[in-house]
From Swiss-Prot:
Its main location: secreted. Residues 6-47 form the Peptidase M12B domain. Keywords: Calcium, Fibrinolytic toxin, Hemorrhagic toxin, Hemostasis impairing toxin, Hydrolase, Metal-binding, Metalloprotease, Protease, Secreted, Toxin, Zinc. This is Snake venom metalloproteinase jararafibrase-4. It is an enzyme of class 3 (hydrolase). One of its GO terms (biological process) is proteolysis. Its cofactor is Zn(2+). It is found in: Secreted. Belongs to the venom metalloproteinase (M12B) family. Binds 1 zinc ion per subunit. GO terms for molecular function: metal ion binding; metalloendopeptidase activity; toxin activity. Its EC number is 3.4.24.-. Inhibited by 1,10-phenanthroline and EDTA. It comes from Bothrops jararaca (Jararaca).
């Protein structure tokens, strides 16, 4: 319910290592980060 909603601030940083891992392909990096956020969202949905 809306009165029980909680929010967190989330900051994600792509470091040079991850940038190099995906050969600077920002679409692949965005996809990976988006998947991470979805997993975290599902994990925190029940707390």
């Amino acid at each position: 319910t809306p009165e029980h909603q909680r929010y967190i601030e989330l900051f994600l940083v792509v470091d040079h290592g991850m940038f190099m891992k995906y050969n600077g392909n920002s679409d692949k990096i965005y996809y990976y980060i988006h998947q991470m956020v979805n997993i975290m969202k599902x994990a925190y949905x029940y707390l």
